[in-house]
């Protein structure tokens, strides 16, 4: 057995989750860790691997302006720009491992930097920056109403809203999320050629101006228990269309988040929990 591990590399990790959106988190600050998409796929398998929605890498910052660098990989091995639930777990990991003692930190990502603020040990506030409603070239979409777009799907025109929270989101308003065909529609929209890099698809049920329910199909993953950036995107759409107030409780399958946005020209904030599950190590 010892000979089996002799030429393999040992990697320590933590298993964490934010509203049951679960992650494998690796500290890469002192030791560079390179995992191929093939290895990430194997590790993400819930039957033969660790099992997770996303892999998070904690890296040292390459700038004096930020404290750490945050990298995210989906279960299929593709690197993505953003993960809101992951950001809270990333912050908690830094606290638990003694990597920071600050109450507020700034982290760089593949796109815009994020500010993470520790309200309590397990309740974390993230500045997700201002939502971007103009990130797509919408020439291929029919402009129906202000910020409403029509996508042809299975011979029908589906009305949706597009917004970026550092990653792309398609928001569909429904009367009830209970029977929404999340995986069927989500998979079809994700593969639509107008989204060459894919898109996260969310189904939003507005209960009142301060409370929504949400189900999410994450690109390259499928339906998940929760998605922080999707919650931000859905609330941003609702506020932009004057359907929601500036503070909204978002009820996802895995739990609840609070999203705060004062409107255009201001950053959007996400408040929610993060949980450490266990520590472990693997040989690859």
Swiss-Prot record:
Could you tell me the Gene Ontology terms of the biological process aspect for this record?
A: lysine biosynthetic process via diaminopimelate
Query: Disulfide pairs?
Result: none
Catalysed reaction(s)?
Answer: (2S,6S)-2,6-diaminopimelate = meso-2,6-diaminopimelate
Q: Which domain of life is it from?
A: Bacteria
Q: What is its EC number?
A: 5.1.1.7
The residues annotated as site (Could be important to modulate the pK values of the two catalytic cysteine residues) are 169, 218
Q: Which Pfam families match?
A: DAP_epimerase
Q: What is its main location?
A: cytoplasm
Output the Gene3D superfamilies linked to this UniProt entry: Diaminopimelate Epimerase, Chain A, domain 1 (3.10.310.10)
The top EC class is isomerase
Q: Where is this site: Important for dimerization?
A: 278
Instruction: Say if the entry is tagged with keyword Transmembrane helix.
Output: no
Q: Which GO terms describe its cellular component?
A: cytosol
| Keyword Isomerase part of the UniProt annotation | yes
Please list the residues that make up the active site: 83, 227
**Which residues are listed for substrate binding in this entry?**
21, 54, 74, 84-85, 167, 200, 218-219, 228-229
**Family note:** Belongs to the diaminopimelate epimerase family.
> Subunit structure, briefly?
Homodimer.
Reported function: Catalyzes the stereoinversion of LL-2,6-diaminopimelate (L,L-DAP) to meso-diaminopimelate (meso-DAP), a precursor of L-lysine and an essential component of the bacterial peptidoglycan.
Tell me the PANTHER family matching this sequence.
DIAMINOPIMELATE EPIMERASE, DIAMINOPIMELATE EPIMERASE, CHLOROPLASTIC
- Please state what the protein is called: Diaminopimelate epimerase
Per the UniProt record, the source organism is Buchnera aphidicola subsp. Acyrthosiphon pisum (strain Tuc7)
The upper taxonomy is:
Bacteria, Pseudomonadati, Pseudomonadota, Gammaproteobacteria, Enterobacterales
Encoding gene per record: dapF
